[in-house]
Amino acid sequence: MSDIQLYLLEADSSNKTEAQGIAARTASRLQQKTLKLIDLVTSLEPHINDKDNGSIRANSVAYLADVIAALPLKVLSVQERRLLCDFILGRLEGDTEGVGASARALVALEGLGKWDTPTAQKVLRAFLDNTHPLRQFKLQTERYAVVQLIDLLVAKYRDAMRKLHNDDHEFMAGFISYWEGEKDPRNLMIIFSLLQVPMTEWDVHAHAQDLFDSVFNYFPITFKPPPDDPYGITSQDLKNRLRDCIAANSDFAPYAFPQLLDKLDSTSMNTKRDVLQALQACITDYEAKTINLYSVTLWDALKFEILNVQEEDLAEEALTSLALLAAKFSYFGEGPLNAYLRPIIKECNEHLEDAPTKQSEAAGRILHALVSSAPQAADKVSKGILPVLFALYNGSESITRRRGLLQAFNQITGGFEKMTGEIPGADCKALQAFADDALAAMVRALVSAPKAEVSFRMASLTGLAQLVSVPGLLSDKQINQAVDTVTNLVLHEQLQGHGDIRTPAIKALSSMALNVPQAVRDRSVPAFMVELPDVPEGDVVPSTVLEAFAQLAAEGQIFDTVVLRLKNKLRSVRHQGASLAYQRALLFAMLYAFTFGSPARDDGVIRSAYYADYADPLTIDFVKDVSSETDPVAVDVVGRIANIILRPQSVHLQSTVYHKAREWLSPANADESGASQHTTPFLLYFYAAMRPEVVEAADVVSMLKAQTVSALSAWASSQAVVTTLRLVSLLVNKFANPKTMQATLAEAGLDVEILTHDSPSAEAIQAAFAVTKGLLIQGKSGSLTTRYLQTLLDLLSGPNSTTTAQNFTTLLAPDEILSKENHCLISGLSQQKLFNQAIPTLTTAIRTATPAQKPAYLTALTGLLRHLPYTLLSPSLTLLTPPLLQTLDLTSSTPDQAAKASALIIFESALMHDAPILTEHTSSLITRLLNSTSTSANGAGVRAKALQCLALVPRQLKREAVVPFRREVVRRLLACLDDGKRSVRGEAVRCRTAWLGLDEGGEEED
């Protein structure tokens, strides 16, 4: 069989891949000269001219298209390509079967060599004359190929296509009507795109309405893509293309604006959004002289969306449209701008006379949008509004009226702030003329207005910050007055509850620090220092002043000033022997500044000089200085500050710091100086900051040995032990070599199997869990971790089972130290590994354990589950439900309360996501939940959570399963309604309502 016959056979059976392979082989023969083009065309004749079968004719053309598409460049000569082009176009005159394949063949031919102008014009003419309208072809794939071809012609042969239009006045009418009725989104995406070429580049004035109508017929787009749409075309894609068409030519304005504004009255919010976005595109792209004809009409329509807000985003879009209009006219001429702004200013002034109202608030938003658009608009709005606004303000004694006017003024100032930020050096003289009046009014409001007038004072505070933020608006004297007013507010206003505006005042002062940092340094910082004496009277810590001062560090312009003053004050305080609480407060302020402030950065990394300037001196004062007055809290805070600065630094800088500190940090020196215990909090954060490659292996072993001694010491404080164990987990996770892990642990005295051998102490058990936690999260020592986990599980059957069980919750408990930010090794499979090994062992042991052993296993199980995601537990819920129910029977001790809380959280998730699994346990679950609501054996947290779970039961489980328990549940919930805790009583009310809703046969409960 010939290639064409094979192709037709495969095409008929819809085996597209095999058919294309046959065409590719034909193309290869053409390339190798074993087949001549004339022979190829001749072989097509009996099939391409088959009068009885249109499918064969179409597939024959498709074969030719696939062959041409598979040909490399330079195989066909110019003459051969021209002959093929004529052959394909000639077919269209008498037979349009396979029109899509014809289009594909022509696209492939064009890819082999660019056409000349006559050829390109002839191709377009042939399709417009012989396939008009395109919608006559029912298959989208055929229309799509034609659309792609014409898009290619319009994009690559712009001059040739424009010449067709210029030479034939009837061409455009046919071109426009060619696309009528197309509905497929893939085709429309290309059609909207190709139509923009004549819309923007050709003279289409005579055809503007037809061209506009051809696309506006699709407005608004209501297309919703089907699920799993392989083409990825969204409704927004179509909207964007259509919007570009509507805004493509100013000649469309007489048709676009009336029709868009008519659709703005639609009750559909989506239609309104599309209209407003289309209006914005038109305003942006149409010529200013054209838009000028419609400016007042547009204002009348847009103001409705702002003055009568239906949806907030619609109001924002309308405001954006008004701003675009103002910006357009600002650079076109004074006449159009005046004509546009005059009615707006008049109406806004009228609304301000009635302030405060929703309309006056909307007027303020309108003024903000106009002022922020351009300097020219800002100047005219200010001159038209501000005289009236301040006349109204000064003529009124009503604080409410003044507040509304001040809020409108703030909108104008905010507009200037935005505009000057986008256009540096913009003129603000119109606003400057009223700056003194505004400043005086705001200062007077903050100082003299009744404290209960919170909104009035807040408006004044906001206004002061905005006045300062507008470049060049205020004189130095005025800036100082504004800064002093806000500073005094922060420092001296002591009002609590309603009327307290210190927090926003601190934010306002931070804002001023951004815009006028020198004024804040010169005025505010000294004022804060006055309120921070070296030795406070009566040892009263000025905590509110410190909190406010530390928050100023959020602004990078004065960060260095804030932390330097805090450091110097801390030194003075220590020198004067002030209270430990005061020193702590200053340290916490520095920590806050470095944590939440804006320190200087080099290449995105916090500046390394901060370590030498701040962390190092603090370390010398609070960590290296060993005395009876050493404060573990201060040591901890200094460690945190050092961690923040060191953590992102390079290996080189960290190595320099580490080797400098290595001598005094070494365990031997620490023991000699007596610093071993009190430096541990610092060591924890110091080593957390270090990259793994910085610390030497020998140092790791010696440090682990020292921590082993501390961890196993029965005399150490509980907090010191916790810190030591966290450090052990960190050292094991990050610095110990996984290849020599067991040897390292054995040398340090931390081998878990040895630690737990022969009735281990509580301290040894805790150390074993700390080591295992570091290994588990690391995930690099799999077999060793498995052995250690099994060793810990075996301890649950020993004499120290209670202590062991309580420690299982630590294995996956979150720890800020063990994080990727601290360069730790974090395995994504640690939770899964622990679950797979521990949970089956524990559930099996619970089934066979004696009553005395069971509480330990239940505590261990819930301790592990507490920190596992529900998605990990869900597949094993059937296995876990019985032991979790037994957990709810535990006694009232503190560990048991934690176990109960963990079980209840899991039941809550199960009821919400996997309720059918719990159906068979309905009776046991309800009984135990009711028992957990009693006050005698359960804490308030457990009681509240049990009630939350109980409330889910009638909603999530089958009605017939829970109705029998309704009467008993409602009766026992009466006691919960008298619970001593309000939170529990609230949950009891909600739970009882849920159960009463079951409506058991119309019976009513008392």
Each model region followed by its residue ranges:
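An aromatic- and glycine-enriched ligand-binding surface/loop that stacks and positions planar moieties
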Residues: 895
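Phosphate/NTP-binding elements of NTP-utilizing enzymes
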Residues: 864
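Structural marker for long, regular alpha helices in very large eukaryotic proteins
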Residues: 2-52, 56-841, 849, 853-860, ...
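Charged/polar low-complexity intrinsically disordered segments, enriched in acidic residues
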Residues: 954-955
